[in-house]
Amino acid sequence: MAEVRVRYAPSPTGHLHIGNARTALFNYLFARHAGGKMILRIEDTDQKRNIDGGVESQMKYLEWLGIDWDEGPGRGGEYGPYFQMERLDLYKKYTDELLEKGLAYRCYMTSEELEAEREAQIARGEAPRYSGAHRNLTQEQEEAFVAEGRTPSIRIRVPESVTYTWNDIVKEDVSFESKDFGDWVIVKKDGIPTYNFAVVVDDHLMAISHVLRGDDHISNTPKQMMIYDAFGWEYPTFGHMTLIVNEEHKKLSKRDQSIIQYIEQYKDLGYLPEALLNFVTLLGWSPVGEQEIFTKEEFIEIFDASRLSKSPAVFDQQKLAWINGQYMKHQSFEEVFEASLPFLQDAGRVSSEPTEEELVWAQNLVGLYREQMTHGAEIVELSEMFFEDELVYDEEANTVLAGETVPAVLSEFASQLRTLEEWTPEAIKGAIKATQKATGQKGKNLFMPIRVATTGQTHGPELPNTIQLLGKDRVLARLDA
């Protein structure tokens, strides 16, 4: 059996989007499950739209997610170069071959002529497509156009009456008719190949066995099959994954500001890469059974492309927050702290170069809220009461403090705290028990007034640990207020 070889081939026109990350991840899992190779190829022919640092950004956040590749930028490989702009001589070689065989031809029509043709077709109620006006130019006609200073594009001769059919990994049987396509451009006037031509040359020369991509590429597939046929090359196996939609079941748009869509943004919010990988894998793929939390190694072991969904994948941010919260609870504390500390520093609550004492305090703070956090950035909002000079009470808190027995409880608790020789959670727990014994109050009548008076909140993490971390002076000042 031939080696499984897949590719992720982004354009450096932007940063790593959640949809592109899913494409990369599914290719990665498919290859690793089969013991095959994943290739990273950069499709950088759209020079006007490429952004500075686009390639580096794609690579950085793929690696951050834990998606590694076997060949490509930073790895090398025997099928390079892996940037399309470094492969122009290869594309020219294969373009010349098609021209020599008569399977492609030069088209000298100007953009104005093409637009006029298109408008006339629309006016007649026809689907706009290239008419083939320059399909059979004589040598004299071509020479005349060249003399006018016209630069040609190169078009493929679309075969007549051919049905292009393939068995898609996701969509099953898919068919297109060649009559629905006009002769399309394979090389633009500037000599740069179009996507559907270059991608076939690259996939063939790089021995790509499976092409897994979004189903917005389905209409590209018959065009690519035309190129495979023109050279007599074998098709790879195609699989077109359903698109990602929002909760209103509309296609996820990069302009939709209500959804965070870039991997970099999630990293900057303190999400954990393992959690994001877990969530993205479940966007359009499902395992057997009800389990939802998996390690990358487990995903590699169980990944089965036949379980790719035929229905659009709904992007549920609450589900992502829940998954990340599970990882915040169970990942190593070092990783959770690393995802949280920068936010405390940015908020000015921990210095940029913390002392050992500050680090220990910050670690205790993150440990205190670890069970409540869904991502690192939340530590700032959750821990606000540690940094407020005056507490602001909501209606529920004021109701608690208005209780008849509250003054006696708070006064006794303050007295008990003043007698403590050690400021530890265990000692504070002892002070709470002593307050219970002295006042006769227990349960909510005991704990709620103490929590509200010291933290301003009716809910929160373990009370003795919270009080210990607040510090004795701050706690007594709040109790005496």
Swiss-Prot record:
Its EC number is 6.1.1.17. A motif ('KMSKS' region) lies at residues 251-255. A motif ('HIGH' region) lies at residues 10-20. It holds the Pfam family Anticodon_2. One of its GO terms (biological process) is glutamyl-tRNA aminoacylation. PROSITE patterns: AA_TRNA_LIGASE_I. It is found in: Cytoplasm. One of its GO terms (cellular component) is cytosol. ATP binds at K254. InterPro entries: aa-tRNA-synth_I_cd-bd (IPR045462), aa-tRNA-synth_I_codon-bd_sub2 (IPR020751), aa-tRNA-synth_I_CS (IPR001412), aa_tRNA-synth_I_cd-bd_sf (IPR008925), Glu-tRNA-ligase_bac/mito (IPR004527), Glu/Gln-tRNA-synth (IPR000924), Glu/Gln-tRNA-synth_Ib_cat-dom (IPR020058), GluQ/Sye (IPR049940). It comes from the Bacteria. It catalyses: tRNA(Glu) + L-glutamate + ATP = L-glutamyl-tRNA(Glu) + AMP + diphosphate. Signal peptide: none annotated. Keywords: Aminoacyl-tRNA synthetase, ATP-binding, Cytoplasm, Ligase, Nucleotide-binding, Protein biosynthesis. One of its GO terms (molecular function) is zinc ion binding. HAMAP family: Glu_tRNA_synth_type1 (MF_00022). Belongs to the class-I aminoacyl-tRNA synthetase family. Glutamate--tRNA ligase type 1 subfamily. Catalyzes the attachment of glutamate to tRNA(Glu) in a two-step reaction: glutamate is first activated by ATP to form Glu-AMP and then transferred to the acceptor end of tRNA(Glu). Monomer. This is Glutamate--tRNA ligase. It comes from Exiguobacterium sibiricum (strain DSM 17290 / CCUG 55495 / CIP 109462 / JCM 13490 / 255-15). The gene is gltX.
